[in-house]
């Protein structure tokens, strides 16, 4: 996302935001042969052949999809707080969603089921046993509780992703989560998603 600033009053500025689909890549005068291009990328000690990560959404990230994406050189990301750990019949749960597109009540009902740590561990282990890199997403509000569980289950990369991720997450009645300190306490690489400012990225 790119931004530009506009004055909206005395001493006030607003940032205009552009989505990626609103942008176009302008080619340069010189092109380069695909044989000379290397698409591999690295996160810590992990190497991937293609620069693609999946969004950790239940509608997309089934165990089979995650495994196949890893085999093709990308990185599939598991949503630890989604349906994987809530419904043993995952295909049946997804079929209910597909049968009623746009009906949010079904999604809310399915996500209201309690999270089964043993089931989530079993499904993460299924991906780990396939030989692909295991990446798991948790939300900022549940990171402190969920991160140790998914790492123990086999997560090799941890994503902390929400609609908006800040340097410190505060909730009434709970202990504030300082992301810099929290990330430093973990033994796996961490990627923050939903970061809207490069200065926040530098903090981590």
Regions found by a protein language model. Give the residues of each.
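Active-site entrance/lid segments in N-terminal catalytic domains of soluble metabolic enzymes
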Residues: 1-202
